[in-house]
């Protein structure tokens, strides 16, 4: 067979594989793997000194090399800004209610915010993390594995009880395996965490809602407003999605079998506002990551971040930050 035929065959095969993946469980598998990317990028940025996290080393693969494109300073700055912004919103919320408040993290991946809060003596009533069972079971293994210099179990109020390999309950910390798109499965699993529906509760979705259809994420938000008396929501995801930047990103993700089913909600601040207001949230603030970087976050910290790896030009960073946003919504 000549080389052209081989290459066109492999093109066809790749296209068929992508189409198959997009409508099957392997689509979910590819989405779950985005957690590995986020963890490795955060681990890389932390090692560079962008921020301090004593816990991520338990979850990251310290021997894996981060792809060159993910080692650009712009990428590390973006990860720093998103982590810092979410942490600031959550800490502010917990302080506002003197710790008598709960945190629920949807699509938590290997996020370490629970440990960062507890180790800094932040007060909270309950912390619940949710992800696909295949992700939570891995997270549980990392939490419980012996050895290492940091013992994650030390942060728990009581001994960890694991069920079905995918759920862990330990005092005020809970990690549960559930598909956020499956309403009754999610509600059943959340019920095992005995959340108090009457106290203030902040929900986090860091790069998660975009993987679900707009209808599904909208009904998830509506359910929260109807079930919790004082919910707040901090959402980080793509933004300004109708230009070439997003098309290239979509194409790259598509080649890895990842579809962004909820991208239409990320088009503009108006779309985000509409989604949260329709779900019953009364106040909705949308900031793109340039605003987060230059106004919302501590400017001494921003100055320190800028020194770590000096950029020759700001255009790429500004372009990247313009395509992500944080939404903070309250009832
Ligand atoms: C890009 S990763 C982000 C992980 C973490 N929030 C962070 O920012 O480091 C997306 C996460 O959302 C989870 N996720 C996406 N769709 C989900 C669903 N329908 N149900 C449960 N988890 C989901 C994935 O498994 C993955 O862990």
Curated annotation (Swiss-Prot):
Establish whether keyword Methyltransferase is in the entry: yes
Q: Does the keyword DNA repair apply?
A: no
Per UniProt, the enzyme's principal EC class comes to transferase
The record's catalysed reaction(s) read:
[phosphatase 2A protein]-C-terminal L-leucine + S-adenosyl-L-methionine = [phosphatase 2A protein]-C-terminal L-leucine methyl ester + S-adenosyl-L-homocysteine
The superkingdom of the source organism is Eukaryota
Query: What's one GO-annotated cellular component?
Result: cytosol
Please tell me where S-adenosyl-L-methionine binds in this chain: 82, 107, 131, 179-180, 206
What the entry lists under Gene3D superfamilies is as follows: Vaccinia Virus protein VP39 (3.40.50.150)
| Pfam families noted in UniProt | LCM
Q: What is its EC number?
A: 2.1.1.233
Q: Do you know which InterPro entries this protein is assigned to? A: LCMT1 (IPR016651), Ppm1/Ppm2/Tcmp (IPR007213), SAM-dependent_MTases_sf (IPR029063)
Could you tell me the Gene Ontology terms of the biological process aspect for this record? methylation; regulation of mitotic cell cycle spindle assembly checkpoint
Q: Which UniProt keywords apply?
A: Methyltransferase, S-adenosyl-L-methionine, Transferase
Coiled-coil parts of chain = none
Which GO MF terms are attached to this record? Answer: protein C-terminal leucine carboxyl O-methyltransferase activity
Family stated for the protein in its record: Belongs to the methyltransferase superfamily. LCMT family.
Query: PANTHER family, alphabetically?
Result: LEUCINE CARBOXYL METHYLTRANSFERASE, LEUCINE CARBOXYL METHYLTRANSFERASE 1
Q: What does this protein do?
A: Methylates the carboxyl group of the C-terminal leucine residue of protein phosphatase 2A catalytic subunits to form alpha-leucine ester residues.
Put simply, this protein is called Probable leucine carboxyl methyltransferase 1
């Amino acid at each position: 067979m000549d080389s052209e035929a081989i290459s066109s065959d492999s093109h066809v095969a790749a296209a068929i594989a992508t189409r198959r993946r997009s409508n099957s469980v392997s689509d979910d598998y590819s989405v779950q793997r985005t957690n590995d990317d986020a963890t490795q990028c955060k681990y890389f940025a932390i090692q560079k000194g962008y921020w301090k996290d004593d816990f991520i080393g338990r979850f990251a693969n310290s021997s894996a090399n981060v792809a060159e494109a993910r080692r650009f300073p712009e990428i590390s700055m973006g990860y720093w800004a998103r982590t810092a912004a979410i942490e600031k919103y959550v800490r502010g919320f917990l302080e506002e209610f003197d710790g008598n408040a709960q945190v629920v993290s949807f699509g938590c991946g290997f996020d370490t915010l629970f440990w960062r809060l507890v180790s800094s003596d932040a007060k909270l009533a309950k912390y619940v993390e949710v992800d696909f069972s295949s992700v939570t079971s891995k997270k549980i293994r990392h939490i419980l594995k012996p050895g290492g210099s940091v013992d994650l179990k030390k942060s728990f109020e009581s001994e960890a009880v694991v069920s079905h390999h995918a759920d862990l309950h330990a005092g005020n910390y809970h990690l549960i395996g559930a598909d956020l798109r499956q309403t009754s499965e999610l509600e059943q699993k959340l019920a095992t965490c005995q959340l108090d529906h009457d106290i203030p509760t902040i929900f986090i979705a860091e790069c998660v809602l975009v993987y679900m259809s707009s209808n599904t994420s909208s009904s998830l938000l509506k359910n929260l407003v109807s079930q919790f008396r004082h919910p707040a929501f901090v959402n980080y995801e793509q933004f300004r999605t109708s230009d070439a930047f997003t098309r290239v990103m979509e194409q790259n993700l598509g080649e890895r079998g990842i579809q962004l089913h909820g991208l239409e909600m990320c088009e503009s601040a108006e779309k985000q506002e509409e989604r949260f207001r329709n779900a019953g949230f009364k106040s909705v603030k949308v900031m793109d990551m340039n605003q987060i970087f230059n106004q919302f976050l501590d400017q001494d910290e921003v100055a320190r971040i800028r020194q770590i790896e000096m950029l020759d030009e700001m255009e790429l960073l500004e372009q990247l930050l313009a395509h992500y946003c944080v939404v903070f919504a309250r009832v």
